[in-house]
């Protein structure tokens, strides 16, 4: 009996020892892999910080040149033709923009290095000619390009590559906007609707803070506003914030619809892509020059500051929205986030003036809420508010973020986003689909109104969204991994 007990104990010790050795070896491999990704994240972040500084410097330079030479708005048709020709003939699917970055993150599709170069050059050209665009889209594409190519160089695969891509996105946001907290969460949240990828948290935090630090160290400057007065928490204030959140979400939905509608109408009117680029650029130039709308060109960074101090009107919000849709919806490169800041701030300033008698507080809420609801990134929105305005209005940022997020629905600027958690339980059938799939499935009342005006245009818009999302491409271009029904 004693010998049997001793034998059993020896066997148990042997098994336990083996498991300990196996667990230790596995932990060592995981630590080694994590350390490798961390080191590569630092490399990507430093490179993105330098690229972000160079990009911001180029935008400041061409903006100064344009403001001193308003005749440059006449170059909009030429710039658009050159841009769409380059992307059509040499872009290697780079025209999908941030949707390609999303798919690359989730499926492992490689991003060719020329995407970053093209978006840098063409976005700068857009701002030189006065197109109403931002900088986030270009920055994220540059960050995604850097991360994808660094990953390919060091043969990073699977989840490690995905973490590196998200870190590159975070580094881009932090470097371009000077908001490291928001940048960290943006990388974890951008690819999904209803999910925050915590597994990439350390890398995204590292990427955003290093990208921001390097960009600032090289000379990038970021101007943030302050909220003059944060109202006390009361039922009246809460009710006004909720109503404002509804307005911001509706405006964000209108913004995304406007861009899709512009794509649809121009695609219907001008089937040839070069003719379409020339015509849309000419119409945009005529609007700027004919109506003297020069200050709405480019980033329009004056809008948030003016809104906080009550120097904007509701007209400013709608003009910036329309001109941005007529810019990014026809082929010009850039981004949408900075225009969203201005649109939301102007709308919020107007709401604040008529409800509280003070535009500053609502302008700040509108600035971040428009961004978050149009891009489906509510947690990033909260962090952006804290980055830009401090934590004093933190509770209000949380409320307005989620209200506007729910009102905006599943429609968003990035058709390739995967829906992981639906915004309402009644939409659970959307889980696993892309935003493009949802737009096609549910439609939109305003889109149906447009179809009533032009019945022959039915389906054009959803096809554009699906093409941007990567769910309808030529057979020879299909990615090796699926791009939809992601869970």
Regions found by a protein language model. Name each.
Residues 1-487:
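Alpha-helical transmembrane segments and immediately membrane-proximal extracytoplasmic
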């Amino acid at each position: 009996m004693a010998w049997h007990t001793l034998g059993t104990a020896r066997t148990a010790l042997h098994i336990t020892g083996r498991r300990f050795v196996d667990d230790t070896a596995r932990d060592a491999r995981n630590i080694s892999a994590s350390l490798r990704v961390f080191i590569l994240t630092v490399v990507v972040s430093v490179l993105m910080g330098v690229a972000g500084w160079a990009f911001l410097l180029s935008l400041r330079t061409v903006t100064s040149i344009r403001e001193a030479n308003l005749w440059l708005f006449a170059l909009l048709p030429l710039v658009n033709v050159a841009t769409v020709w380059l992307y059509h003939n040499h872009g290697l699917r780079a025209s999908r923009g941030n949707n390609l970055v999303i798919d690359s993150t989730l499926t492992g599709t490689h991003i060719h290095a020329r995407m970053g170069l093209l978006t840098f050059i063409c976005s700068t050209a857009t701002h030189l000619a006065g197109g109403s665009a931002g900088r986030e889209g270009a920055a994220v594409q540059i960050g995604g390009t850097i991360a994808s190519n660094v990953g390919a160089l060091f043969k990073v695969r699977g989840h490690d590559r995905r973490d590196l891509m998200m870190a590159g996105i975070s580094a881009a946001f932090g470097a371009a906007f000077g908001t490291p907290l928001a940048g960290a969460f943006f990388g974890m949240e951008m690819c999904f609707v209803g999910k925050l990828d915590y597994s990439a948290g350390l890398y995204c935090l590292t990427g955003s803070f290093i990208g921001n630090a390097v960009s600032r160290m090289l000379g990038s400057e970021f101007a943030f506003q302050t909220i003059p007065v944060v109202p006390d928490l009361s039922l009246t204030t809460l009710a006004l914030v909720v109503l404002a959140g509804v307005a911001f979400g509706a405006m964000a939905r209108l913004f995304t619809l406007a861009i899709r509608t512009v794509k649809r109408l121009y695609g219907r009117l001008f089937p040839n892509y070069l003719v379409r680029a020339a015509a849309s650029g000419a119409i945009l130039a005529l609007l700027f020059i004919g109506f003297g709308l020069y200050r709405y060109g480019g980033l329009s960074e004056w809008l948030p500051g003016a809104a906080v101090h009550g120097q904007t009107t509701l007209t400013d919000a709608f003009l910036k929205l329309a001109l941005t849709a007529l810019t990014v919806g026809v082929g010009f490169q850039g981004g949408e986030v900075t225009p969203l800041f201005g649109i939301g701030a102007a709308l919020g300033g107007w709401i604040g003036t008529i409800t509280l008698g003070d535009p500053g507080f609502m302008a700040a809420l509108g600035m971040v809420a428009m961004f978050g609801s149009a891009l489906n990134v509510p947690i990033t929105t909260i962090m952006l508010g804290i980055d830009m305005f401090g934590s004093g209005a933190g509770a209000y940022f949380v409320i307005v973020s989620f209200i506007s997020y729910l009102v905006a629905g599943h429609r968003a600027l990035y058709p390739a986003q995967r829906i992981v958690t639906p915004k309402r339980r009644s939409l659970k059938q959307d889980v696993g689909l892309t935003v493009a799939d949802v737009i096609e499935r549910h439609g939109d009342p305003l889109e149906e109104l447009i179809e009533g005006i032009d019945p022959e245009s039915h389906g054009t818009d959803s096809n554009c969204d699906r093409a941007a999302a990567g769910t309808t491409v030529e057979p020879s271009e299909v990615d090796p991994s699926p791009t939809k029904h992601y869970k």
